[in-house]
């Protein structure tokens, strides 16, 4: 007990710094965990509040999960959610690392700051705002693309009914919005690499590409592994704004835009089935946890120093 008290006294300033984040986690992550019981109930809101509604709602076991995955759209939403996220993870990784390496090779610090700012800007834009820009290009009546097509004598294209372009467009927009944030982290790591490694490689006659391949990329391995493990944990979670706002929830596009989060939202707004929505959220969390553990075990087998825990 004395040792614990001494530790508190010696580190009180650090504990104080952690306190806001810890309170945020407790209030918005740990306390709401108890609400997962709704996933196993036929939840109906009563006038006596949330707790009373949970207590008095009937237990239905796994019925909410059965309803979620017995629908005809279960395969489509699972396929879309997983495949899009795999694209975001691996293509986004290549783009982010590539941009970070290019930035590290620039000698003008002013240019680096300009590029960093321009790349980070999309990260802070709302999907609602981005959807207006995409609509300005794709709209069948006043869109820039259709205006160009008609000006050269071609027929208008209804992009909001054309399934072919949307997987590529959504992948592009998702990576475009997020790669700036990731590339800044990789760039910061590259800037922290000991310059003597590069000097030794140069003395040995290594070309620029060989220095990147044998010095830069190995030094990024740990960060790449950690970020990939965390991303894999969210592979069953889709960016709701991207898949709902950009295609305007168009029914003709459901085969390529319908993901788990959009499906749950549409089901919730149409049927007000809170139990099913909770079941979907719990399913995403449990699968995400399992994937993080498995990914970490795999990373530990390959390189113990790169494992998350």
Task: Give, region by region, the residue ranges found by the protein language model.
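A structural signal for multi-pass alpha-helical bundles of membrane permease subunits
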Residues: 2-309
